[in-house]
């Protein structure tokens, strides 16, 4: 059992140097009220904190580590690349090699991509590119979907049934006072009626609609039938660009991502996380007619000293090649199914008001009777009981993503022994969470 109290000392030291003791806010674990572990090392499906406590990891660097920690092939690629230089400030062979591997896997012709260092950079660039291509400046996104911390994708004007009929007036008023600034409209996820009404009113002025094909940052939320199809159809009708954010889902459920799972293709697709194999890599990809609007061929600006870093590119290629191995995704699916099915059965048999939602190797526990369809329903979950459940599991060495609004992940290297142990821990934690409230 982890010695949780000792970690307070190390976390207090981290707080001397970093705001909240972290360099990304969710790592502070505030939603579940635990002292965040400080990691010393990690291998396969285990990380070890600074006091030697072992944790079975179901966060996996927020979905990046589909191959687990310290995979030998990825480590070898990193070490070999670093021995030739860590950064060039020029196009490298490793960039071309990873791009070639990607296009072969994705089976795309007449497409181009641009590598960047983070999902935020990729989505920010995708939106800027869409505005440059369409000469429009309205961005549509959906409440609860996270696309990085660029202002244009964090803030905006919310649209719901209360102000739906006044969208055109809201837009006109905004641009009258701030004619040069983009406007972001935030709509409810999974609401086709509201989305289509907004597009009917102002669709010709919309630069892009950005969406997650499966929501991850309010927990795993599946799209309702017809929702994604409506987004793509309305974008085509009004000549807006669709941007599919696959920073998390890309290469998680299949080598071709949601293009093959849902049979949908957006104008621009954004990748990250698994693409880097644990290193900082992201990319945006689109037909060359769109991508060639970027400098130096076009007028849309994007730049980055570490974009296409040769060491990160080598790690990314190794990660993608591992994903391409025979039966990789079917094995991962079977591993996840075998792990979660007994937990689902206990939830049903005991009548717990808990929805265990999964898609591929991603899963979330929602403490409510039915799976939520949007952020409003997520916020109705029993957060207090989720916290009890989480802290009990954590005390026994199981590390889920530390918020009810975050997904957890299975990797290809989770051992059956650790999964069996975690099954028992999660079932016991569920039972105790309902005994203690």
From Swiss-Prot:
Main localization, broad class: cytoplasm
Pathway the protein contributes to: Porphyrin-containing compound metabolism; protoporphyrin-IX biosynthesis; 5-aminolevulinate from L-glutamyl-tRNA(Glu): step 2/2
Subcellular location per the Swiss-Prot or TrEMBL entry: Cytoplasm
Keywords in alphabetical order: Cytoplasm, Isomerase, Porphyrin biosynthesis, Pyridoxal phosphate
Reactions the enzyme catalyzes: (S)-4-amino-5-oxopentanoate = 5-aminolevulinate
GO biological process: protoporphyrinogen IX biosynthetic process
Modification N6-(pyridoxal phosphate)lysine, positions: 273
EC number of the protein: 5.4.3.8
Cofactor(s) in the UniProt record: pyridoxal 5'-phosphate
Coiled-coil annotated residue ranges, if any: none
UniProt cross-references to Gene3D superfamilies, sorted A to Z: Aspartate Aminotransferase, domain 1, Type I PLP-dependent aspartate aminotransferase-like (Major domain)
Name of the top EC class for this enzyme: isomerase
PROSITE patterns per record: AA_TRANSFER_CLASS_3
GO molecular function: glutamate-1-semialdehyde 2,1-aminomutase activity; pyridoxal phosphate binding; transaminase activity
Record's subunit section: Homodimer.
NCBIfam families reported for this sequence: PRK00062.1, PRK00615.1
Homology family: Belongs to the class-III pyridoxal-phosphate-dependent aminotransferase family. HemL subfamily.
Protein's name in the database: Glutamate-1-semialdehyde 2,1-aminomutase
Organism: Chlamydia felis (strain Fe/C-56) (Chlamydophila felis)
């Amino acid at each position: 059992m982890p010695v949780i109290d000792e970690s307070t000392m190390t976390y207090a030291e981290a707080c001397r140097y970093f705001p909240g003791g972290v360099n990304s806010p969710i790592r502070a674990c505030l939603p579940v009220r635990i002292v965040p572990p400080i990691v010393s090392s990690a291998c396969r499906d285990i990380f070890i904190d600074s006091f030697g406590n072992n944790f079975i990891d179901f966060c996996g660097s927020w979905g990046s580590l589909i191959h687990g920690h310290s995979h030998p092939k990825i480590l070898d690629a990193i070490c070999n690349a670093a021995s030739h230089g860590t950064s060039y400030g020029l196009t490298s062979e490793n960039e071309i090699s990873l791009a070639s591997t990607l296009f072969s896997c994705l089976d795309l012709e007449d497409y181009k991509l641009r590598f960047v260092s983070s999902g935020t950079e990729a989505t920010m660039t995708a939106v800027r590119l869409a505005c440059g291509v369409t000469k429009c400046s309205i961005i549509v996104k959906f409440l609860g979907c996270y696309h990085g911390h660029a202002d244009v994708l964090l803030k905006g004007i919310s649209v719901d049934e209360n102000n739906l009929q006044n969208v055109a007036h809201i837009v006109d008023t905004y641009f009258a006072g701030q004619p040069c600034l983009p406007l972001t409209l935030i709509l409810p996820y999974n609401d086709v009626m509201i989305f289509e009404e907004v597009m009917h009113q102002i669709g010709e002025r919309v630069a892009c609609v950005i969406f997650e094909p499966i929501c991850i940052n309010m927990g795993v939320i599946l799209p309702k039938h017809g929702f994604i199809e409506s987004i793509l159809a309305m974008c085509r009708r009004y000549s807006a660009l669709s941007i599919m954010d696959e920073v998390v889902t890309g290469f998680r459920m299949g080598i071709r991502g949601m293009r093959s799972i849902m049979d949908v293709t957006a104008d621009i697709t954004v990748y990250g996380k698994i693409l880097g194999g644990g290193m900082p890599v992201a990319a945006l990809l689109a037909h060359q007619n769109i991508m060639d609007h970027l400098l130096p061929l076009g007028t849309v600006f994007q730049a980055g000293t570490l974009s296409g870093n040769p060491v990160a590119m080598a790690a990314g290629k190794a990660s993608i090649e591992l994903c391409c191995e025979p039966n990789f995704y079917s094995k991962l699916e079977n591993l996840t199914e075998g792990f979660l099915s007994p937990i689902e059965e206990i939830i049903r048999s005991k009548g717990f008001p808990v929805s265990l939602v999964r898609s591929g190797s991603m899963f979330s526990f929602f403490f409510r009777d039915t799976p939520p369809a949007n952020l409003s329903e997520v916020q109705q979950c029993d957060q207090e009981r989720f916290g009890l459940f989480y802290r009990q599991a954590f005390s026994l060495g199981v590390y889920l993503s530390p918020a009810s609004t975050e997904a957890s992940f299975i990797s290809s290297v989770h051992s059956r022994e650790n999964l069996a142990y975690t099954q028992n821990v999660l079932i016991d934690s569920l039972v105790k969470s309902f005994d203690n409230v």
